Amino acid sequence: METVQSALYLFCFARSNLIGELEGTGVDGQHPLSVFRPFPNLCAVQSEVRLEDFCGATAELRMQDLAWIGPRALRHEAVVEEVMRHSPVLPVRFGTLFSSQERLAEFVDRHGAAISQFLERVANQEEWSVRGLLDRRQAGRALTSASLAAQEAQLAALLPGRRYFEEQRIRAGAEKELSLWLEETRRQVANHLRQQASDFCECPEVPRESPESGIEVVLNWAFLLPKSATPAFRARINQVNEKHAMGGLVLELSGPWPPYRFVPPLSIGATP
């Protein structure tokens, strides 16, 4: 009979004194969750998985199959978020494996100080995501209208033919003006929001809408916020939207999330 090799699947690290025994199963829906407590103040949330599910040629195919990976990724997130309700967490990426409890213990022994420092840093804090959606056509029209209004007195003094060409010149320059406006607006908004945050990072801008819609993601930011600052941060998001929505820019706020974007590099990964 062929022996099925298993591995330890890691969800996150947390404060040992704040986490009891966990109920439920891991990402495979079969193996139970467990808590490994290598130090008095530090624990790892884990479960067993079949090694072949995550390593090897067939595993590479599974990782491209949304029907397979989707429910497991959602379960991963659900476990981390459940732990986060009771303790600060250092979340790890989906599919992080260790070959044995001993290998995980060695990893914690090497990086325990950094993990503990991170847990202390994010205590009573949460990650929030902010995305900026720009309706490029609406923004272009708003800037053109503002430019025409600002130069109305000068335009009114021109002969009709000259005025027409001058208005066309203003419209033609709208795209360049839009780029400059967007760059400056991004800078101002980031500075405005960062005043409430303990940390901030810019993330890759993932397209949301089709190019034909004229709506595009023009900023994708993550903020580490003290829980007490959340109401004021929401208020600042609303202020930005009140100021810029008519000009085509709207911010979307989502969270709270585990602080994935702020985890220090620890070279976490499968260990032979």
Where are the model-predicted features located?
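An interfacial alpha-helical scaffold signature
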Residues: 1-272
